[in-house]
């Protein structure tokens, strides 16, 4: 059930990231927009892959990749904010959602590790 909520949140986040990429491309910013587009949409893709993992180790691996992508996305968001491509309100909204997913991913990974002992 928690993974369904995480899947839903990651899909909503990916949609917001794609909209951000469109906004950045209108501002003629392409390097960071490509990076955040990849990392921000990869979170949900890896969570979706984890749903059909070949066992606990594979599940944990996919969720750890999603966590790494979420951390990378947080970096790009901060960089966009600090270089004035996005405002404080947009940064706070997206970073809050990204942080929430990171917390859920850490929890899912820890639960899977504890259940595999």
Give the label of every model feature segment.
Residues 1-117:
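Short, C-terminally biased terminal segments at protein or domain edges
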């Amino acid at each position: 059930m928690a993974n369904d909520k995480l899947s839903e949140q990651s899909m909503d986040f990916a949609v917001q990231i794609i909209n951000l990429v469109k906004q950045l491309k209108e501002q003629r910013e392409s390097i960071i927009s490509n990076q955040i587009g990849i990392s921000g949409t990869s979170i949900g893709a890896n969570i979706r892959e984890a749903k059909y993992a070949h066992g606990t180790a594979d599940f944990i691996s996919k969720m750890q990749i999603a966590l790494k992508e979420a951390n990378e996305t947080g970096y790009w968001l901060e960089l966009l904010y600090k270089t004035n491509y996005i405002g404080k309100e947009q940064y706070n909204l997206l970073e809050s959602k990204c942080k929430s997913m990171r917390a859920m991913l850490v929890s899912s990974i820890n639960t899977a590790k504890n259940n595999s002992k």
